Amino acid sequence: MGLLPARTAVLNYMNTVSEADVHQVMAALKPQYGQEKQFKEPLFLEHLMSLECNGYLEQAGYDLDDKDDLRILFRITDDGRLAVQKYISKTFQ
């Protein structure tokens, strides 16, 4: 079985948790996507922000991590859940 496109995999993962930041998303997807050249924090943050712009995710909060870097938490919206149910095969959910 193949892999979902990375952005779709991010949305699918967000459907399984109450909220997550980019590091948590990447840790969860690393077993499947960690060897990809594009498995980089800036790109995965872009995936999260793009899904937010499209109404599938929303910001759940923010704070500073232990390195004093900004950490943005996201959560899935009802539209995001509907998109997962409608467009992502049950095999991947």
Go through the PLM ranges and name each one.
Residues 12, 16, 31-35, 63:
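General structural signal for alpha-helix termini and helix-helix connectors
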Residues 1-19, 92:
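Short alpha-helical segments that sit at the start of domains
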Residues 52-63:
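A short, conserved structural fragment
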Residues 45-52:
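Short, hydrophobic-biased segments on the C-terminal half of alpha helices
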Residues 72-93:
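Short, amphipathic alpha-helical interaction segments positioned at domain boundaries
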Residues 61-72:
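Short, Lys/Arg-rich nucleic-acid/phosphate-binding segment
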Residues 31-45:
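Short, positively charged loop/turn segments that connect secondary-structure elements
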Residues 20-31:
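Short acidic, hydrophobic short linear motifs in intrinsically disordered regions
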